[in-house]
């Protein structure tokens, strides 16, 4: 009797930092930290205001208005909790394109403008913490 083996797809690897693009926001390439310790993804935004079911914000000096898909209470690494507006937008990472829910917050004091959390990468990628920029510039080792 032959047993049917369940095969899992081989997922592409990500480095712990990657270049991503958000076409809807016309961002060009941005460096994102791939953060398996964070459930949600986050994007640096300024002058954030929610008006009805829309959210207005500035990113890299450009004004944007997108559909608000919700708000999420986030406890940051420094222990503070805040409610952040959330958008859904396309993320381009190398040859991969996918929709992701992203919270908006002031990340001006952070090293990179964007975090990609577990919800965005789950089932799509595996993270290789010894590498960076696997899908973009020449790959680097840690």
Whereabouts are the PLM-identified features?
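Pepsin/retropepsin-fold aspartyl endopeptidases
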Residues: 1-142
């Amino acid at each position: 009797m032959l047993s049917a083996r369940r095969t899992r797809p081989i997922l592409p690897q990500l480095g712990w930092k990657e270049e991503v693009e958000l076409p809807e926001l016309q961002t060009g390439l941005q460096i994102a930290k791939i953060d398996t310790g964070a459930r949600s993804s986050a994007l640096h935004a300024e002058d954030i205001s929610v008006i009805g079911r829309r959210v207005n914000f500035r990113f890299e000096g450009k004004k944007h208005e997108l559909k608000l898909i919700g708000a999420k209470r986030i406890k940051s690494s420094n222990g503070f909790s805040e409610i952040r507006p959330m958008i859904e937008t396309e993320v381009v990472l190398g040859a991969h394109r996918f929709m992701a829910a992203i919270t908006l917050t002031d990340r001006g004091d952070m090293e990179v403008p964007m975090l990609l959390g577990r919800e965005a990468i789950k089932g799509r990628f595996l993270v290789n913490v010894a590498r960076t920029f696997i899908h973009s510039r020449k790959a680097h080792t840690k």
